């Protein structure tokens, strides 16, 4: 896994450079990356576990060739709404009553050599290089915290005069058993 109970992270992360830093807020330029993502219907809580399980099965060998793929961080999650391309970490984003969850694939893989998923609900795609605003926080990765930190990042972007071009998405870097105050969580928003 990517972290011990005490918080030591060992998982690879997507490459990026920091363009601007202001306390917990950053603007980053991410390299292009490949993600495995799935879209699920339901609440944040219910789709978090289901999405993670689907994607974990894929990287643990439920793919053509039964190849194991190293776990990376973060896990990305976002709500499905408008058609907005997704970026880095394990990410989760909301889409109406649907949530997207994605694992970033290790950098050594390409679309050509990455094992194909057996599960038809898992989509493999390349995410182009992009500029992303982020805010880092610790604690529980709850829907309430995601909404709170998304609002803070949106407000910071407005004060900076930076235009957001995506919905907020969450990025979690640690397994669920990590002590909450040691967890690394982030909110990401694509920007111009």
Please state what every model-predicted region is:
Residues 1-192:
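A solvent-exposed interaction/effector surface
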């Amino acid at each position: 896994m990517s972290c011990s109970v005490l918080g030591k992270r060992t998982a690879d992360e997507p490459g990026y450079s920091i363009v601007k830093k202001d306390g917990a807020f950053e603007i980053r330029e991410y390299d292009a990356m490949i993600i495995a993502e799935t879209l699920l219907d339901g609440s944040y809580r219910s789709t978090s576990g289901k999405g993670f399980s689907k994607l974990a099965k894929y990287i643990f060998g439920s793919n053509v060739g039964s190849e194991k793929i190293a776990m990376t961080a973060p896990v990305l999650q976002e709500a499905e709404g408008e058609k907005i391309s997704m970026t880095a970490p394990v990410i989760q984003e909301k889409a109406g009553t649907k949530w997207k969850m994605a694992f970033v694939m290790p950098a050594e893989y390409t679309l050509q050599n990455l094992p194909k998923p057996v599960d038809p609900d898992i989509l493999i795609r390349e995410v182009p290089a992009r500029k992303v605003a982020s805010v880092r926080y610790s604690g529980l990765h709850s829907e309430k915290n995601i909404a709170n930190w998304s609002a803070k990042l949106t407000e910071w972007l407005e004060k900076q005069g930076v235009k957001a071009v995506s919905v907020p998405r969450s990025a979690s870097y640690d397994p669920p058993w990590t002590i909450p105050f040691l967890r690394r969580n982030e909110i990401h928003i694509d920007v111009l």
